[in-house]
Amino acid sequence: MNIKDCYNFEDFRKLAKKKLPSPIFHYIDGGADDEVTLNRNTNAFNDCDLVPNILASVGEPDLSTTVFGRKIDMPLFLSPTAMQSLYTPEGDKASARAAEKFGTMYSMSTMASFSIEEIANISSGPKLFQLYVHKDQSITDDLIDRCRRANFDGLCLTVDTLVAGNRERDHRTGFTTPPKLTLESLLSFAMRPEWVFKYLTNKKFELANIKHKTDKGTNIAKSVIDYINEQYDPKMNWKDAEYCIKRWNGPFALKGVMSVEDAKRAIDIGCTAIMISNHGGRQLDGSRSPFDQVKAISDAVGDKLEIILDGGIRRGSHVLKALAAGATACSFGKAFLFSLGAGGQKGVERLLDNMQKEIRRNMILMGCKKIEDLDASKIIYRN
């Protein structure tokens, strides 16, 4: 099986599982606690049906939309995800180049494997930076200022990771950053010699954006949970978010909004967008899925800011359902990380090509000429 044989999410997942050591595969694949929310994120789309209109003379549909002040060629972009060099040596560079090739947005994590400046130098495409509020205020300020100098288009502040979720798979596999060989993980790494060779012969693992501020999580092997609990500020509040918005002074989203009340308050403090997200089911297990919440939030604030649905996207039809329910665009992480692990930049390009074709095909079948044609009349909920 190779990249050319990958036609859907499960194909990329299977190929990534064959190529990645078990701790790294399960870091992508897993969620919090019993993984109820992880599974619900995708299953929620099954409770909604698309309603097509026939004989609409669609021709070639326009898939473009605008987010964070930039036009993107399809209403789907890459979510910010950490430590991408664990999946392929090129890491974020591969993702950014693939996103630019398909005219969509690349999103960078604070915990990226390459720096803000390195990505700005290799990509002129739309770029979003994901910010965390650190206990050390100078780290937060430095990240915001560097993004401005590097001409990133927008910032999103992640607000659902005050403490790390209970990711039991990581406990069982002994996942650390950088990877550390233990009795539990030794066999899984030994079974992936190609990955081990690439890891040992390429750029040393580091959290490139913050390496000059702290060595925690860079040259010291520790769990992601430990890093989050040590570095991120669990006392973050609305004033902290407003401070970041004012310091950035540009397109800004809160990532992790799940209630109408919080969406309204995001407007009050100056957000231009929100990302409806539960961190891919990796934080609070038992919480609602983004798709379950998007209609209520859109009905309340959809005319005042951009709404990004983040989580559970596996198919082009999921994107159409989210847009019809009121989202401006969607983002996905797990799917593209599997494609990155399965085939590097070419893997991500294959995934984006698949998704673009699915969205286009389904737009034609729905009788929709442009994204704005996808409204509440195009879906019916089963319950």
Could you describe each region identified by the protein language model?
Residues 100-122, 126-140:
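A gly/proline- and charged-residue-enriched helix-loop-helix capping module
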